[in-house]
C-alpha cells in the first residue's frame, strides 16, 4: 500500500506550544482539521479553520469533557484498514470517515501529582482517557495513520508532507507509533503508582511491584574499570524523573566518568546536609568524605576541610554550599581536583578555573530530591529501600552519662552525626570546632575505624583532645569507646541499643565523657 495522503486530522493537545502554526500549515496543504475544547478555541481564535469533533460524532461533549472522543465514528475512522474491503464497506455503511492524522498529548498527570498541595480529586481529573485511546488506535493502524505526541515532531512531519505530496513515510509513522506506546506505558505506570501509594499509604519501596524506566542519557568511555562498559541513565519510577541534566550543568572539562558520577552523588548528598547553614565545604575521595568543615567564610571552611587530610584531596571532588568566590577558588586551585561543584560561581572565577582543562566544573541547578526510593542491583535481584534521609535533631538526643555535653560539644556532636551518615561503615568521625579532624571509614571492626581516624589525625598534625566523636552504629563493646577516649575525645554520639550499653556508659562515665544516644543507626554499605 502506498503512503496515504493526509486529508483529515484530529488535534487535541494540552501542550499548545506550536500547535497554531502547525495546524495553519496543515490547513494550507488542504488538510481538514477537527478539534476539541481548549484546542479548538485556540485554533479558531487564531484564525485557523477547525471544526468541533462533534461534527464527526453527532454527539456533544458531555460530563465536563470526560466524554468527547470515545465514539465509533472516531475509533472506526482511526482503526479501519484501508485496503480491507470489509472494513471499507462497514465504514461506508455506518457513515464513518477515515482520520489520517492524530495530534494528541495527554493531561499532565505526572506534573499535577508532583505538586505538594495537589488533592486526590485533582489528580483523578487529570487522568486522560480519550487521549490514550485515540493515540493507541492511531498507533496500531500506523500503516495508514500518522500520530504525533509532542511538538518536537511537528516540523519533521510537515517537511515530509511537503516532500511527499501530503503523505508521510512508513518509517516515520512507525517511529511515531513507537513513541505512543512508550508514552502511554509510562503514563499508565505513573497513575498506577499514584493510586497504589494513595490506597496503601506506603512508600514505593513497600509496594508489591515497581516499574522503573531507564533511558540512556550519557554514554561513558568505560565503567568503574576500563574493561567494563557503562552508561548513565535517566530514571523514572513513577515518583518523579531523575536525570543528570535536570540537576547539574557541566560548565567545563571532560565528560564525567562512572566513578566521577558516584563521587558527585556522594558529594552533593553530603553538602545537602548544610544547604541553609553557614558556609560549608565537602571533600570526597572514592565516595567517602576525607574533609568537611563549616566556618564564617567559604575559604576558611575549605582550608579547615583540607587540613583534615592533606593527601587524599588530590584528584578528589569538592562541593560547597555557597557561590564559589575568587579567594576560595584560588585556594582550591593550589591542588588538582577532578570536580568542583557549586550552586553558583562569582564573576571571574570560571575564567580562572578553566585554565586547567582536565578539571570538571559543575553547576548544581537545584537541591536534590529528599524523599526518593533507592535501588541497588545484585546478581540475583534488586534491593529497594527508602533513602536514609532522616537526621536526629537535638530534641531526639538522650544524654546517658553523668556529664551533660557543653554547648560547643553539642554543636560538634550534631556536625559529626551529619557526616557519619555519609561514610562507609564501620564509621568513626572525630570533629572539633565544626571541622572533621579524623575519619575512619569502611573497616570490619569499629575499633579499627577509631584507630585509623586517630592515625589520620596524627598524620595531619591535628589535636583530638576535646573533640567530639560519632559512631554510625552502637559500640558492641566498650573497647571502641575507650579507643576514642584514649585519643582525647570528650563527647560521643551514637545510636545506642547494644546489649552492653551499660558497660559502654560506665566506661564513658569513668573517663568523664558526655555521651548521647540518637536511637537511629546510619549504616552505609
Curated annotation (Swiss-Prot):
SMART domains: AICARFT_IMPCHas, MGS. Gene3D superfamilies: 3.40.140.20, Methylglyoxal synthase-like domain. One of its GO terms (biological process) is 'de novo' IMP biosynthetic process. It comes from the Bacteria. The keyword Nucleotide-binding does not apply. Belongs to the PurH family. The IMP cyclohydrolase activity resides in the N-terminal region. This is Bifunctional purine biosynthesis protein PurH. It comes from Chlorobium phaeobacteroides (strain BS1).
